[in-house]
Amino acid sequence: EKVKEHYLSTLQPAKAKTILGCIELLESRYYEVARPPELQKQLDREWIADMKDYPEDLIHQACVNWRNSSQSFAPRSAGVLMESVKPEYVRRKSLYLKAKSVLELI
């Protein structure tokens, strides 16, 4: 059971506040467009919805990877931003599912 909990802990989703904090900090490094408050709220909701399954450490790592890339603009979508950490996320999910299925056999 501890093994399953360990792998599950590596998939613990980030909180909405963490997601927005990371995105706001990353976007602040680039040219920012003034947006009406309602539009900004909708964009924030979309970022949260699109990234709600990702663990906090992978969101931070994706932001670091973006900052250290040759991109001269802020990411426009979660898919583009998270591309660099997607293999690690998939690896973690696979390990969790394997551990879970093995433990169910025991």
List the predicted regions and their residue ranges.
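Charged interaction scaffolds used for protein-protein
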Residues: E1-I106
